[in-house]
Structures are given as C-alpha cells and as structure tokens.
Amino acid sequence: METATLVAIFISCLLVSFTGYAPYTASGQPSNELRDLFEEHED
C-alpha cells in the first residue's frame, strides 16, 4: 500500500480508539476514582 493510505488508516485508528476510550473513562470502571468537585466545595 502507499504511504498516504497507511497514514490515513493509522490516524483513523487513533481517532476511533480515543473516541472509545473517552466514554469508558467517563462512565466505566475508572470513573469511580474521579472526584466530584461540586460535593467537595459546598457553601
């Protein structure tokens, strides 16, 4: 394959993996470690 095709496939895979990892971090198993800043600073 040509170099441009491989670069396009590589960038596409990076975008898809980041798009899948972001919701997993926000609502999956690692979200238990996130802090709620609004609960920490109640006035």
Swiss-Prot record:
What domain of life does the native source organism fall in? Eukaryota
Spans through the membrane: 5-27
Chief place where the protein resides: plastid
What is the protein's membrane topology class?
Answer: Single-pass membrane protein
Give a Pfam family name. Answer: PsbN
Family classification = Belongs to the PsbN family.
Task performed by this protein: May play a role in photosystem I and II biogenesis.
Give the PANTHER family listed for this entry: PROTEIN PSBN
Protein name in UniProt: Protein PsbN
Protein source organism: Anthoceros angustus
Starting at the broadest rank, the lineage of the source organism is: Eukaryota, Viridiplantae, Streptophyta, Embryophyta, Anthocerotophyta
Q: Which gene encodes it?
A: psbN
